[in-house]
């Protein structure tokens, strides 16, 4: 079974957490695209969605799902998103698609974070297989990079990428994260950082892993 099929299995399993007549929080990325496509079958049963990226907004609208802004809602029942890495505790690295800031905002509105992944995204230590994205105000790029080096990382500027917020991304390589919550706060306190891709303060409450044997749910 290929990776796409496993993503579809996880995405479809997440539908059980979507209640009728609610507004659903939706992230971004390839696994979320599978979820949005599945959610299209419930378009008439839900009020709509709040999306974490412009690309997700467009995909939702194309399926007839009304899109609300984060400022129009006070709370979401669930937020459903993928991850680049996830630990058994539900800590994640996200931001491969450069939507990390909006993903943090929308996920913070939700009572429950449902993370949908294929088995390749499971790790014991964050930073094992994926670089840590950091969204940075453009004028602070070099300063922030030096601070990330001081923390032990190897930051690289993600060229030709501008976030939906008009900022740039530094990807931090060779950077294993043994204390995710502490490191999330440390990096966010660097002047010029908008946010980083560690999701430890807002961790996943439920992880759904797509496998060749079906969906594995970790709560």
Curated annotation (Swiss-Prot):
Molecular function terms from GO: ribose-5-phosphate isomerase activity
Catalysed reaction, written as an equation: aldehydo-D-ribose 5-phosphate = D-ribulose 5-phosphate
Database matches in Gene3D superfamilies: 3.30.70.260, 3.40.50.1360
E.C. designation(s): 5.3.1.6
GO biological process, one term: pentose-phosphate shunt, non-oxidative branch
Known partners and oligomeric status: Homodimer.
Name used for this protein in its record: Ribose-5-phosphate isomerase A
Organism: Glaesserella parasuis serovar 5 (strain SH0165)
Phylogenetic lineage: Bacteria, Pseudomonadati, Pseudomonadota, Gammaproteobacteria, Pasteurellales
């Amino acid at each position: 079974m290929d990776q796409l099929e496993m993503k579809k299995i996880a995405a479809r399993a997440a539908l059980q957490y979507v209640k009728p007549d609610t507004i659903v929080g939706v992230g971004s990325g390839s696994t979320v695209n599978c979820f949005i496509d599945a959610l299209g079958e419930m378009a008439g049963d839900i009020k709509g969605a709040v999306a974490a990226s412009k690309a997700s907004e467009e995909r939702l609208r194309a399926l007839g799902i009304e899109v609300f802004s984060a400022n129009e809602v006070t709370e979401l029942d669930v937020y459903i998103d993928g991850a680049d890495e996830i630990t058994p505790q539900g800590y994640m690295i996200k931001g491969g698609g450069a939507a990390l800031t909006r993903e943090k905002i929308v996920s913070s509105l939700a009572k429950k974070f449902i993370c949908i992944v294929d088995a390749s995204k499971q790790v014991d230590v964050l930073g094992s297989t994926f670089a840590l994205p950091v969204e940075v105000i453009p004028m602070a790029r070099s300063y922030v990079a030096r601070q990330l080096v001081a923390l032990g990382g190897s930051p690289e500027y993600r060229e030709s990428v501008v976030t939906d917020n008009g900022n740039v991304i530094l990807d931090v390589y060779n950077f294993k994260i043994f204390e995710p919550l502490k490191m999330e706060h440390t990096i966010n306190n660097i002047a010029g950082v908008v946010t980083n891709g560690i999701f430890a303060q807002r961790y996943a409450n439920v992880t759904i892993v797509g496998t060749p044997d079906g969906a594995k749910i970790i709560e």
